[in-house]
Amino acid sequence: MFLSAVTFAKSKSKTILVKMVSQAGTGFSFNTKRSRLWEKLTLLHYDPVVKKKVLFVEQKKIRSL
């Protein structure tokens, strides 16, 4: 019996870490996770610079989880 080193393709993770950026123009951002199957996130979240809830949009994918 011969054993060989076989490299299998790594499966993609179900969730990804994304960077959310404030649309108020303050430059405030935070990271959150979302499902890989969902469309890009858009949500209301508290921005401490303007001290209000403002719209945050997904800027980029950071990594897979």
UniProtKB/Swiss-Prot annotation:
The keyword Hydrolase does not apply. GO terms for molecular function: structural constituent of ribosome. GO terms for biological process: translation. It comes from the Eukaryota. Pfam families: Ribosomal_L33. Component of the mitochondrial ribosome large subunit (39S) which comprises a 16S rRNA and about 50 distinct proteins. This is Large ribosomal subunit protein bL33m. It comes from Bos taurus.
